[in-house]
């Protein structure tokens, strides 16, 4: 799963350090967009495969296989952990063999995750074996995402030049959240008619379509850039804004894993509407307000954004109607959108210019950690206290993030 920064400064010399696009949205020239369009479309199709199973997988693991909420959390969160653990290797491969190689390897691997979903659904396997096959699919999807996203980001930057890195980040970020917003409702719509196997078929086909697009794009040289600065050397400079980012990611991760189950517990239909509201608000705010951290100050924007997130999570927690849950999800997306660029500004200003791109790559890892850890941890909480606890935890995380903003300012002065 999983986060983006508004960042207009020069990128790192090693494009492998730019793994999750985080950019301020600007309207590129038509010629620029024509060059980026195949890359953006490939990202969109690749991430459809990532997002389509999210809501449907929760129902498959709980209702069909008979496992509890904690297992649901693990099944969903393991993909993000796999993405985090393979991020460095994917970047190294991209540098050594070129972006095209990474993309053409990563997209078929992502398609294999869809195949695993199909096999787990149609083969006469026991519940534990089916779950194991699903988990293998999730792990393969995590590796595939690391490869194709790193490669497509690097490919896009190489095609338009480092001066247009911000435009590449912006459009790729929008493609990712458009896919996340459309994928989950699509999966939930397909599942009642064709079962989870139908969801798996779509998750198999979409990355292959992206692979066909990538196959037609001209290759660019491998960067062969310098070694990346070790994470621990940058960690001391960026951990405060990074931790705020991680805490702000908890509500999104909780919604991805448990919003569908929350709807089911209440007997409501159309959980995908709430997820669509989240993504629509995220994209709209990113398009219209990406310059606010520069104009109003990163900390001020982050405070307002986190407040919206907290209110949204409380609304979902206390929702007595589907409309209230949709409103809560929409407010969560509205707030989540600008936490990334705001904290990204603080993180990149905390390091020397020559390490700024590396700081971006390591900063994004905080969101990966949150995406991977939230599902299992919140799953255990919901097992003891009910599904609604997931959103209470999300609200609490944003409140802790608000408190941490004071230490972010202190850390910058120190």
Regions found by a protein language model. Give the residues of each.
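Helix-loop boundary and gating motifs at the non-cytosolic
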Residues: 34-75, 80, 244, 252-262, ...
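Helix-loop-helix hairpin linking two adjacent transmembrane segments in secondary transporters
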Residues: 171-215
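Residue-level signature of mid-helix packing/kink "hotspots" within the transmembrane helices
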Residues: 80-88, 180-181, 282-287, 372
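Cytoplasmic helix-loop-helix junction between adjacent transmembrane helices
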Residues: 137-175
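C-terminal membrane-cytosol helix-exit motif in multi-pass small-molecule transporters
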Residues: 204-223, 404-409
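Helix-to-loop junctions at the C-terminal end of transmembrane segments
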Residues: 86-98, 285-298, 382-383
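C-terminal ends and interior cores of transmembrane alpha-helices
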Residues: 108-127, 308-320
């Amino acid at each position: 799963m999983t986060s983006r920064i508004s960042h207009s400064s020069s990128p790192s010399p090693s494009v492998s350090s730019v793994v999750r696009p985080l950019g301020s949205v600007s309207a590129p020239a038509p010629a620029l967009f024509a060059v980026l369009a195949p890359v953006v479309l490939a990202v969109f199709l690749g991430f459809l495969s990532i997002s389509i199973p999210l809501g449907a997988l929760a129902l498959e693991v709980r209702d069909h296989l008979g496992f509890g909420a904690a297992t649901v959390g693990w099944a969903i969160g393991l993909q993000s952990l796999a993405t985090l653990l393979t991020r460095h290797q994917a970047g190294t491969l991209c540098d050594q063999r070129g972006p095209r190689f990474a993309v053409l390897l990563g997209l078929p691997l992502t398609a294999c995750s869809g195949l695993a979903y199909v096999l787990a659904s149609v083969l006469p396997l026991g519940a534990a074996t089916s779950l194991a096959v699903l988990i293998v699919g999730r792990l393969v999807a995590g590796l595939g995402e690391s490869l194709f996203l790193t490669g497509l980001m690097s490919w896009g930057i190489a095609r338009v030049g480092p001066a247009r890195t911000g435009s590449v980040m912006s459009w790729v970020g929008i493609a990712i959240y458009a896919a996340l917003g459309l994928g989950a409702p699509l999966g939930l719509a397909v599942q009642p008619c064709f079962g989870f196997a139908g969801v798996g078929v779509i998750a198999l086909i979409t990355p292959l379509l992206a692979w066909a697009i990538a196959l037609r794009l001209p290759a660019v040289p491998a960067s062969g850039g310098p070694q990346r600065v070790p994470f621990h050397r940058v960690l001391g400079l960026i951990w405060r804004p990074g931790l705020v980012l991680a805490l702000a990611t908890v509500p999104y991760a909780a919604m991805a894993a448990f919003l569908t189950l929350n709807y089911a517990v209440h007997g409501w239909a159309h959980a995908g509407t709430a997820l669509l509201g989240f993504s629509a608000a995220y994209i709209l705010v990113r398009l219209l307000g990406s310059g606010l951290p520069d104009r109003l100050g990163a900390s001020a924007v982050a405070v307002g954004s986190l407040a919206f997130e907290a209110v949204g999570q409380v609304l979902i927690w206390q929702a007595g109607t589907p409309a209230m849950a949709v409103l809560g999800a929409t407010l969560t997306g509205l707030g989540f959108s600008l936490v990334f660029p705001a904290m990204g500004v603080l993180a990149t200003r905390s390091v020397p210019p020559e390490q700024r791109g590396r700081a971006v790559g390591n900063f994004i890892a905080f969101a990966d950690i949150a995406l991977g850890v939230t599902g299992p941890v919140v799953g255990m909480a919901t097992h003891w206290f009910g599904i609604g606890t997931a959103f209470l935890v999300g609200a609490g995380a944003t409140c802790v993030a608000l408190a941490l903003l004071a230490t972010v300012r202190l850390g910058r002065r120190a």
